[in-house]
UniProtKB/Swiss-Prot annotation:
Protein name stated in the entry: Polycomb complex protein BMI-1-A
BP-aspect Gene Ontology terms: negative regulation of gene expression, epigenetic; negative regulation of transcription by RNA polymerase II
One GO CC term on file: PRC1 complex
Quaternary structure, from the entry: Component of a PRC1-like complex. Interacts with cbx4.
Biased composition (Low complexity): 290-303
Keyword field contains Metal-binding: yes
Keywords: Chromatin regulator, Metal-binding, Nucleus, Repressor, Transcription, Transcription regulation, Zinc, Zinc-finger
Short motif Nuclear localization signal, span: 81-95
Organism annotation: Xenopus laevis
Start-end of RING-type zinc fingers: 18-57
Length: 326
């Protein structure tokens, strides 16, 4: 499982700041030849006296460099969403400017150029903004029946009233919301609470602002959240020392069992018995001269017949067969 890494905004500053003015991008504009970005006013003013990129010195255009720059709306939205309060402060400065200079108002300018765009229209959320959310119990059986056509008819008043509405700051984390649910509903500690968006469990460090950005909440209603309660799964930890002791004791029991079986199954005849003892065979039948010891008595190969002596041998010499005795 991949671990999520959180980084500070200061580590992203080199990618969000203009090298000409040293501030965050405002009306981010990118040179199409090298893809370096700057503030619109900064790069336009710079290209009045130069035709080369301020960073890499690539030629923007031979005669009309303003033709090879483009407004980068995606980059500007990222900057507004990452830097707290930047969008609201910029809109306020624009409104103040046009209020102080009415003649500078351009009829063809957009509402954003005049600073008349609200945070809701731009979908920019600030940390101190209050977000309305709804939370209800996640019923798996109800989710399985979601495709039925008569689901609206089957809803009862209890199911409709089961949803609760809250107003929370955008910086509220899922961990805080889980603690609120546990204390509000007296859920024991041996049960785990999962806060979900649709059918996906949310991370504890997610804020309401993160959820609104990740799942593209359109502000057309309360942020819909759900929760479920399930028992906590405890993993049984095995002590390796105990496991090694049990394994050793099992081996000892098996060894003792084999010894008992051997002592019961092998009967060694006594020398005082009237029954003659069977001849002792060498553990090495092909090498009978090697002696073996049984019950402290050494038996030599001399008591056995040597298979290499007193045996007739057939010898062939120049086609004439002769038999000789060893």
């Amino acid at each position: 499982m991949h671990r999520t890494t959180r980084i500070k905004i200061t580590e992203l500053n080199p990618h969000l700041m203009c090298v000409l003015c040293g501030g965050y991008f405002i009306d981010a504009t990118t040179i199409i030849e090298c893809l370096h970005s700057f503030c619109k006013t900064c790069i336009v003013r710079y290209l009045e006296t130069s035709k080369y990129c301020p960073i890499c010195d690539v030629q923007v255009h031979k005669t009309r460099p303003l033709l090879n720059i483009r407004a980068d709306k995606t980059l500007q939205d990222i900057v507004y969403k990452l830097v707290p309060g930047l969008f609201k402060g910029e809109m306020k400065r624009r409104r103040d400017f046009y209020a102080a200079h009415p003649s500078a108002d351009v009829a063809n300018g957009s509402n954003e150029d005049r600073g008349e765009v609200a945070d809701e229209d731009k979908r920019i959320i600030t940390d101190d903004e209050i977000i309305s959310l709804s939370i209800e119990f996640f019923d798996q059986n109800k989710a399985d029946r979601k495709g039925s056509k008569d689901k609206d008819k089957e809803k009862s008043k209890d199911e409709i009233n089961d949803k609760r509405y809250l107003r929370c700051p955008a910086a509220l984390t899922i961990m805080h919301l889980r603690k609120f649910l546990r204390s509000k509903m007296d859920i024991p500690s041996n049960f785990q609470i999962d806060v979900m968006y649709e059918e996906e469990a949310l991370k504890d460090y997610y804020t309401l602002m993160d959820i609104a950005y990740i799942y593209t909440w359109r502000r057309n209603g309360p942020l819909p959240l759900k929760y479920r309660v399930r028992p906590t799964c405890k993993r049984v930890k095995i002590n390796p020392h105990t496991d090694r002791i049990n394994h050793t004791s099992g081996d000892m029991e098996s060894d003792s069992g084999s010894d008992k079986a051997g002592s019961l199954g092998v009967v060694i005849p006594s020398t005082s018995s009237c029954i003659p003892s069977p001849p002792v065979q060498s553990p090495h039948p092909h090498f009978p001269h090697i002696s073996s010891t049984i019950n402290g008595t050494s038996s030599s190969s001399s008591s056995h017949q040597n298979p290499f002596t007193n045996r007739a041998r057939k010898i062939s010499l120049n086609g004439v067969s002769a038999i000789s005795s060893g």
